[in-house]
């Protein structure tokens, strides 16, 4: 499933990547 992490990654990487989120289509999604 692609659950939004409530974070965008247009200018900076996903800070929520430490929680297992990754950037996709300029939005951070949970893996």
Swiss-Prot record:
Keywords: Disulfide bond, Knottin, Plant defense
Maturation and modification: Contains 3 disulfide bonds. This is a cyclic peptide.
General function of this protein: Probably participates in a plant defense mechanism. Not active against Gram-negative bacterium E.coli ATCC 700926 or Gram-positive bacterium S.aureus ATCC 12600 up to a concentration of 100 uM under low-salt conditions.
Protein name (record): Cliotide T14
Organism: Clitoria ternatea
Tissue: Expressed in seed but not in root nodules.
Cross-link Cyclopeptide (Asp-Asn) mapped to chain: 1-31
Positions of disulphide bridges: 5-21, 9-23, 14-28
Comment text on domains: The presence of a 'disulfide through disulfide knot' structurally defines this protein as a knottin.
Family recorded in the similarity comment: Belongs to the cyclotide family. Bracelet subfamily.
Classification via InterPro entries: Cyclotide, Cyclotide_bracelet_CS, Cyclotide_sf
GO biological process, any: defense response
Pfam families the record matches: Cyclotide (PF03784)
């Amino acid at each position: 499933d692609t659950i939004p992490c409530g974070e965008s990654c247009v200018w900076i990487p996903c800070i929520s990547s430490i929680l297992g989120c990754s950037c996709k289509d300029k939005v951070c999604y949970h893996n």
